[in-house]
């Protein structure tokens, strides 16, 4: 269960809480504050989680908001970093997909891969990430005219 600082005038920490299977209350023994954690390659910590998808075995593919520079496309900030999170070890690592606009942060599991909607300086569309090999497509495998802000796989 992710919690975030999005749309708050007074920021709070962002991260994850847990509700154990068969219960209805938050587990007081588990919480992970991502807004105080260092993300390799960045000088500032993530502020919140604009999108995430649980992919099994304690792993989450997500976008985290890391506002480090004035990188933008026109008036649109590029500050959403694709990451793989490990809820068990409370670690996150950047995925080799470009930093995206917050308007294009769709994440969907597709068979044994993960699809990331992304809008960056070079292209707009859908990237493919393979969590087993930790590899990603070097560019959008499907390009879009608008932002890929939502996806749903109607399969197994």
Q: What residue ranges belong to the model's regions?
A:
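Short, small-residue-biased leader/transition segments that mark boundaries at the very start
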Residues: 2-6
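Hydrophobic, glycine-enriched assembly/anchoring segments
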Residues: 117-156
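Active-site-proximal structural scaffolding
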Residues: 9-12, 144
């Amino acid at each position: 269960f992710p919690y975030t600082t999005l749309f708050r005038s007074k920021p709070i920490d962002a991260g994850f809480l847990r509700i154990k299977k068969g219960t209805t209350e938050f587990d007081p023994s588990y919480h992970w504050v991502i807004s105080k954690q260092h993300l390799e390659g960045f000088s500032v910590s993530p502020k919140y989680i604009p999108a995430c998808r649980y992919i099994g075995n304690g792993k989450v593919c997500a976008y985290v908001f890391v506002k480090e520079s004035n990188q933008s496309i026109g008036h649109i900030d590029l500050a959403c970093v694709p990451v793989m999170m490990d809820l068990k070890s409370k670690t996150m690592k950047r995925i080799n997909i470009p930093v995206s606009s917050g308007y294009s942060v769709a994440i969907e599991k597709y068979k044994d891969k993960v699809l990331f909607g992304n809008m960056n300086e070079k292209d707009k569309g859908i990237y493919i990430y393979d969590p087993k090999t930790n590899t990603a497509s070097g560019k959008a495998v499907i390009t879009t005219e608008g932002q890929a802000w939502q996806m749903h796989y109607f399969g197994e």
